[in-house]
Design a protein with these regions (language model features):
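Active-site microenvironment of metallo-dependent hydrolases
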Residues: 2-65, 70-73, 80, 399-499
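Metal-coordinating catalytic core of metallo-dependent amide/deamination hydrolases
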Residues: 36-37, 172-316
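Active-site gating loops and adjacent loop-to-helix segments of metal-dependent hydrolytic enzymes
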Residues: 113-142, 197-217, 281-302, 324-327, ...
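Alpha-helical scaffold segments that flank or form the walls of functional sites
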Residues: 114-165, 169-187, 222-237, 481-485
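Glycine-enriched alpha-helix->loop->beta-strand junction motifs that scaffold or abut catalytic
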Residues: 267-270, 300-303, 320-329, 349-354
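His/Asp/Glu-enriched, well-ordered alpha-helical/loop segment
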Residues: 298-300, 304, 345-432
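A conserved active-site cap/scaffold subdomain adjacent to cofactor or substrate pockets
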Residues: 329-331, 335-339, 343, 350-352, ...
């Protein structure tokens, strides 16, 4: 049986799918490339003479400006800074901007790029594909998928992610998933989704009735034990990668079930409580969960609460999200074909913390600049969205993928080029023949930049990409490992029969 992407709206609600700093002289240090699994402390680095998109409302755009990074943070911004003992990067003619933020990505799916492309009839097979591949993963596969997916994010200029990990059903696999993402050095929040053990495996079969019955129930106790184990893998909010959990949302089920699940999750104190949420227009009772308004009235929202998608939310629901300091991520490229328009424009206008994300690498490009532009074009689906779009500046559009987006995953440490912020920065080349030399910097980047322009990436002050290549990573060898793994996983998935 084939389930469409639209069918995910129901299944995803269940458990299964579910001021400058003083600069004292120091001896010069030779640059050293480190492998990701040995990512060392940030080096003192001076980016010299860059044109800077700060996305800091107090600073704006700066031309011919120096930025000093030390101890993983931005410690000075100014003209012709006098600095000794730092690696100097000549950024003349280049654009420096904050690292980008993805507020909803299934990192593990990044290695399956092209398995279910959006522009293809097979997009309707997404759920069938996901359910079958999901159960074939080993702990070793979980590590490789998360490690490679984390590197792909950094390679594309994404330096913070909310990883909605809706797979892996053993403590060993989830632990390796965390280790892979941590070894990749990608900051953000790892939010593993509580669910239930699948009712089938490689070589097995199941009916959709069995799957639906299983997915509509509360997480099993083994998954709660795994969640407690995952919590033990994180030391606290000072980590680059922080602990989160993702919950099923039981639309059409008693709201008390969601309340009980949320309460138990919050006892584990996740940095983010993430949910997939798709609006339902069915008639509802006070006991049957249908919308965010009910969750708000039940006291389930809060500053840890994060919604992925949320398309079609009503104004009163957006007001509740704002008043509870809750967060939203719109995956605008994928949502363009959804029955209701993406919510990011209206959410931003309402004062909600909102950003954008890719969602899944199986269907969409990792060139995040395309998603930035897609978030703008998506607004033109409706007359209301068009008016919002026409009121936005290029800085507003970039902010939806950086400063505003960072706030929308509770990542206050990043998102702008400001003194004291974490040194997550991107350096873009501008020497491409068709890269414009006129208009504001943000307008040039928002309209014209692409993955090919990305020269360098620093994460917490550590150079992860230089001269267009990842530092200390043999990407060709990694690709061979990934291809071998995905070929095996897909072959195993083909042995599963869903009817």
């Amino acid at each position: 049986m084939s389930i469409t992407r639209k069918g995910l709206l129901g299944l995803a609600s269940g458990g299964l799918l579910a001021a400058a700093v003083g600069t004292t002289a120091r001896p010069a240090v030779a640059a050293t490339a480190r492998a990701p699994e040995r990512i060392g402390p940030a080096r003192r680095t001076l980016i010299r003479n860059a044109d800077v998109i700060t996305l800091d409302a107090q600073l704006g755009e700066l031309h011919g400006t120096d930025v000093l990074m030390e101890g993983g943070k931005i410690v000075a911004i100014g003209k012709a800074l006098a600095v000794d003992g730092a690696e100097v990067v000549d950024a003349t003619g280049m654009i420096l901007m904050p690292g980008m933020v993805d507020g909803h990505r299934h990192i593990w799916q990044s290695v399956h790029s092209g398995a279910i492309p959006k522009i293809s009839p097979v997009i309707n097979d997404y759920i069938n594909w996901k359910m079958r591949v999901d159960v074939c993963y080993t702990p070793e596969d979980a590590y490789l998928a998360q490690y490679a997916g984390g590197l792909l994010s950094i390679d594309s200029g994404v330096t913070s992610v909310l990883d909605f990990c809706h797979t892996f059903h053993s403590a060993e696999a989830v632990e390796q998933a965390v280790k892979g993402l941590r070894d990749a050095g990608l900051p953000g929040t790892f939010a593993w989704q509580l669910s239930r053990h699948p009712v089938f495996g490689p070589g097995g079969s199941a009916t959709m009735a069995q799957i639906m019955t299983n997915s509509g129930q509360a997480p099993d106790e083994d998954h709660w034990r795994i969640a407690e184990h995952v919590r033990s893998l994180f030391s606290g909010d000072d980590d680059l990668l922080r602990f989160g959990l993702a919950s099923p949302i039981y639309q059409d089920a008693p709201i008390s079930r969601t309340a009980e699940t949320f309460a138990r999750i919050r006892r584990l104190q996740p940095h983010v409580l993430a949910v997939h949420y798709h609006r339902s227009d069915k008639p509802f009772s006070d006991q049957s969960l249908q919308n965010v308004r009910q969750m708000g009235e039940a006291g389930l929202l809060g500053p840890d609460f994060h919604i992925a998608h949320g398309h079609g939310m009503h104004d009163v629901e957006l007001q509740m999200m704002r008043d509870n300091d809750s967060m939203i991520c719109a995956t605008t490229m994928g949502e363009h074909s959804y029955p209701f328009p993406s919510v990011h424009g209206r959410a931003a206008r309402a004062g909600v913390k909102v950003g954008i994300g890719i969602d899944t690498g199986v269907a969409f490009t990792h060139d995040y600049f395309q998603h930035v532009r897609g978030s703008y074009y998506n607004l033109f689906r409706t007359d209301e969205g068009k008016q919002i779009a026409l009121s936005m500046s290029a800085e507003d559009v970039l902010n939806m993928a950086s400063g505003r987006a960072a706030a929308a995953i509770r990542e206050a440490r990043a998102g702008t080029i400001s003194v004291g912020k974490r040194a997550d920065v991107l350096l873009l080349r501008t020497d491409r023949l068709d890269f414009p030399v006129m208009r504001a910097l943000a307008e040039r980047v928002a309209n014209f930049s692409s993955y090919s322009d990305l020269d360098s990436v620093w994460v917490a002050g550590v150079a992860r990409k230089r001269d267009g290549r990842m530092v200390g990573v043999d990407m060709a060898a990694l690709k061979q490992k990934v291809n071998a793994m995905t070929e095996r996983l897909h072959a195993q998935a083909d042995t599963i029969r869903l009817t």
